[in-house]
């Protein structure tokens, strides 16, 4: 497997609409204010988080069960700044819609700006021929409330091209998160 460059990413966007909307270069300023950067980088793409969040709460005294997830574990918010309570968790989604080629696996890593504040971003790999908005998982590991800024950079996607095309893609096996829109909760 090889990690793919900015040139390859740009061509995949032009020829296959791999990322929409697409920022051709790093955006660091918006409306004369510094922001957490997003857009194309040397060997990856920094994606933005939308203003749609689901924040974990204990107001309903439920339990988190991945096989029987209770939507009442969360409160929905559409905000420019999401406040994650201390030692808590929130879900968001990318502004960008991704369409992954059959010979590519995508890995997500967090932005250092958030990591240095104790905010960890987790995303499972984007598999060959998966498409949709990416649901982002934010963990606030600090004993203090933490801010996530909507429409600014949240994570970086790295594109790994396989030496061979896979026999069975995410689309072939009709994966349960195929073509997800918005923040998607656990499915079994």
From Swiss-Prot:
Gene Ontology molecular function terms on file: dCTP deaminase activity; nucleotide binding
Q: Which residues bind dCTP?
A: 111-116, 135-137, 156, 170, 179-180
Q: Tell me which residues this entry annotates as catalytic.
A: 137 (proton donor/acceptor)
Subunit structure, briefly?
A: Homotrimer.
Family, according to the entry, reads as follows: Belongs to the dCTP deaminase family.
Q: Which CDD domains match?
A: trimeric_dUTPase (cd07557)
This chain's function reads: Catalyzes the deamination of dCTP to dUTP.
Q: In which pathway does it act?
A: Pyrimidine metabolism; dUMP biosynthesis; dUMP from dCTP (dUTP route): step 1/2
Domain of life where this protein originates? Bacteria
Q: Establish whether keyword Hydrolase is in the entry.
A: yes
Annotated protein name in UniProt: dCTP deaminase
Among its keywords, does the record have Nucleotide-binding? yes
> What keywords are assigned to this protein?
Hydrolase, Nucleotide metabolism, Nucleotide-binding
Pfam families the UniProt entry points to: DCD (PF22769)
State which Enzyme Commission number(s) the record gives. 3.5.4.13
An annotated GO BP: dUMP biosynthetic process
Catalytic activity annotation: dCTP + H2O + H(+) = dUTP + NH4(+)
PANTHER family documented for this protein: DCTP DEAMINASE (PTHR42680:SF3)
Signal peptide as annotated in the record: none
